[in-house]
Amino acid sequence: MAKGHRSQIKRERNANKDTRPSAKLSYARVSVQKACFVLDAIRGKDVTTALGILTYNPRYASSIIKQLLESAIANAENNNGMSVENLYIEECYANKGPTMKRIRPRAQGRAYRIEKRMSHITLVLNER
């Protein structure tokens, strides 16, 4: 058990918090594999370059990730006071979420299972 006064423990915990601007989308209706195709294309890029890539990328996941990136940019400006010109994508990853199970009727009374996969997508920005 931790020793010390409760307020001191809180202060220490808040001092160790990550202050980089970020945005997280939970339960996105796109599989991790499909989201990672788009995330690999923008990892390490400047924010303006990444927005251009996401705008003209034909994949469905790119529209979701573009909204998430715009949210992370707004967080950086409003919460951290950073300028957009210096921002770049430091981390971006997709973790596996729950799977919705659905049934597809087939011939002669059979049924095939369809798995609609979800993911949790996280973007972390930083200044150069």
PLM regions: where:
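Ribosome large-subunit tunnel/peptidyl-transferase-proximal elements
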Residues: 2-94, 118-128
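Strongly charged
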Residues: 97-128
